Regions:
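Dinucleotide-binding Rossmann-like beta1-alpha1 core, especially the glycine-rich loop
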Residues: 46-129, 288-290
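Short beta-strand to alpha-helix junction loop
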Residues: 61-65, 95-104, 144-163, 276-281, ...
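Short hydrophobic core segments
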Residues: 6-8, 196-208, 346
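Active-site substrate-recognition segment that forms the wall
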Residues: 16-24, 31-33, 46, 82-87, ...
């Protein structure tokens, strides 16, 4: 009898897991309740982990693999007729006011190139070169450039993966899935009063992960981190080829087609699922942007987006089977790396669910670090 798989949560991670299961001819049902504030839907992602100052090797392995996997994923999606992914390799600018910091970033890039040739060309840019590449930056700054940097629209690439999975006979249900336990074993889920049975259940519900596991009397240490992002409309609509920009103080800017410019972001802990966009966050992000790109004061404010990143205590994603319920797999805690890591980790999660070899060492991302029995 053919194994049945259920994926609960169709953000970028769950959509990827479903797609890769479907690519391997598995029978998959994807269930998502489409919560307001899901991280994937508001995320505009910069794919350029190689110049990050984060030193954790387990995190960097995932981020490096995630960035390298994107071209293969985009090719697979195109083969399945999905072209509107919001992904483009446009290069990345790492901006700083201090020359010394730029030299440190480039030295790190040179060290990492051997294992990550997808970094592409790296070099230091003059003030004039920066303005030529990204005309809105008019203040004198220094920059390290990596030609392999890319940007992606979280909503679009996730929708493309869902569409592709459905074309491969995956089923999609919008609804609230509750895990069902019989005789100490998870037999499936209940959605709208109907029980759907499965052999393997994958839980990828992000910031809502703890809620999903409540029927199992387990407590997952994952919390929502509120992110707010400005979406601006520029007069020039020829913006799709502008490089992504990363600057100090968690400022980033990335442009899409037709003059859309995203400016982010905030990292707000202990706000719960507060969906309100706040003037304080808008002011904070705008002021940071104006310091390097003062002409953005004349841009039109289109929207202030709000979403919730799933964060775990040590900020390293977790993946694995629940020790107490071996047919339930969980992956979570991608934080602000979700768009870089999500598609690749979803592929690995699908392999794990099917008993196939994984590239990652799951011991480096132990689920047991964040799971506790409820008292």
């Amino acid at each position: 009898m053919t194994k049945q798989y259920i994926v609960i949560g169709a953000g970028i991670l769950g959509a990827s897991a479903a797609l890769h299961l479907a690519l391997n001819k598995a029978q998959v049902t994807v269930i998502d309740r489409n919560d307001a504030g899901k991280a994937t839907n508001v995320a505009a992602g910069i794919i350029s982990p190689w110049l990050s100052q984060r030193r954790n090797k387990a995190w960097y392995f995932l981020a490096k693999k995630g960035a390298a996997y994107y071209p293969q994923l985009i090719e697979k999606l195109a083969e399945l007729g999905e072209f509107d992914t919001g992904y483009a390799q446009v290069g990345a600018l790492h901006i700083h006011s201090e020359e010394k910091r730029i030299e440190q970033i480039l030295a790190l890039a040179d060290k990492r190139k051997a294992e990550a040739p997808e970094i592409g060309e790296t070099r230091k840019l003059s003030v004039e070169e920066i303005t030529k590449m990204f005309p809105y930056i008019t203040e004198p700054m220094r920059a390290a450039y990596a030609s392999g940097g890319a940007r992606v629209d979280g909503r679009k690439v996730t929708q493309s993966m869902k569409n592709a999975a459905i074309k491969l006979d995956a089923k999609y249900i919008e609804g609230d899935a509750a895990l069902q336990v019989e005789d100490g074993k998870v037999i499936g889920v209940m959605v709208d009063g109907i029980v759907i049975e499965a052999d393997e259940i994958i839980v990828t519900t992000g910031a809502w992960g703890n809620e999903t596991l409540q029927p199992l009397k387990l407590d997952m240490q994952v919390k929502p981190q509120k992110a707010q992002i400005l979406e601006l409309q520029l007069e020039s609509e020829k913006t799709e080829h502008l490089p992504v920009v990363m600057a100090p103080s968690t400022l980033y800017m990335l442009a899409f087609e037709e003059g859309r410019l995203m400016v982010g972001t905030t990292h707000e802990d202990d706000k719960g699922f507060d969906m309100r966009p706040t003037i304080g966050a808008a002011h904070e992000m705008a002021e940071k942007a104006f310091q390097i790109a003062p002409d953005l004061r004349e841009a039109q404010l289109s929207e202030l987006k709000v979403g919730f990143r799933p964060v775990v205590p040590n900020a390293i994603p977790v993946i694995g089977r629940l020790p107490q319920f071996s047919n339930v797999l969980v992956a979570n805690g991608l934080g602000s790396s979700g768009l870089t890591v999500g598609p690749y980790l979803g592929k690995e999660l699908a392999a794990l669910a099917q008993g196939l070899a994984t590239e990652i060492d799951v011991d480096n991302y132990q689920l047991t670090n964040v799971i506790r029995h409820e008292k």
